[in-house]
Amino acid sequence: MGKIWVLHGPNLNLLGRREPDKYGTQTLDEINNELLHKAYTAGIPIQVEQTNFEGELIQWIHSMGPDDFLIINPGAWTHYSYAVRDAITSVQVPAIEVHLSNIHAREEFRKTSVIAPVCCGQISGLGGKSYSLALDYALEALTQK
C-alpha cells in the first residue's frame, strides 16, 4: 500500500501568525496533527514535510513511490514553479493542490496555478479544512487500490 505525502511550501511554517485574516489562526502543527491522526486511524502511512527551499521539495517528490499520493500546498511556487510541476509529472503519482485561502479571489497573479494542471484536483479557500478534504480523497483513493 502506498503512502500519503503532505508537502507544505514556503512560509507555511508561519501559519497562525502570518496574515491571519487570509490564512487563519490555525498553526501548521495543528493542521499536521489532525492529518497525522486521521491517517493513523485509517491505517495509512503518512509523511508530512515543510520547506522554504524549492530543491528540497523537489527531492521529496522524487523520492515518492508509484503507489503514493501527494497533497501539496506549493505556496507562492504555485504561480511560477515549472520545476515543481515537472517533478510531479516525473513521478506520475496522483496529486491534489491545496490552499488555505481562495487563490481565485485574491490578487491577479495568485489566480494562476502552473501546478493544478498536473494534479487530479485543487481545493482552496477552506482554511485547514482544505487539507482535511484532500486527505479524505487520498485515503479513499489508496484504500481502493
UniProtKB/Swiss-Prot annotation:
Binding site for substrate: N73, H79, D86, L100, S101, R110
BP terms from Gene Ontology: amino acid biosynthetic process; aromatic amino acid family biosynthetic process; chorismate biosynthetic process; quinate catabolic process
Domain of life: Bacteria
Pathway(s) it belongs to: Metabolic intermediate biosynthesis; chorismate biosynthesis; chorismate from D-erythrose 4-phosphate and phosphoenolpyruvate: step 3/7
Assigned EC number: 4.2.1.10
Active site: Y23 (proton acceptor), H99 (proton donor)
Keyword Lyase: yes
Keywords: Amino-acid biosynthesis, Aromatic amino acid biosynthesis, Lyase
Catalytic activity, as annotated: 3-dehydroquinate = 3-dehydroshikimate + H2O
Family, similarity comment: Belongs to the type-II 3-dehydroquinase family.
Name of the molecule in the record: 3-dehydroquinate dehydratase
Species whose genome carries this gene: Desulfitobacterium hafniense (strain DSM 10664 / DCB-2)
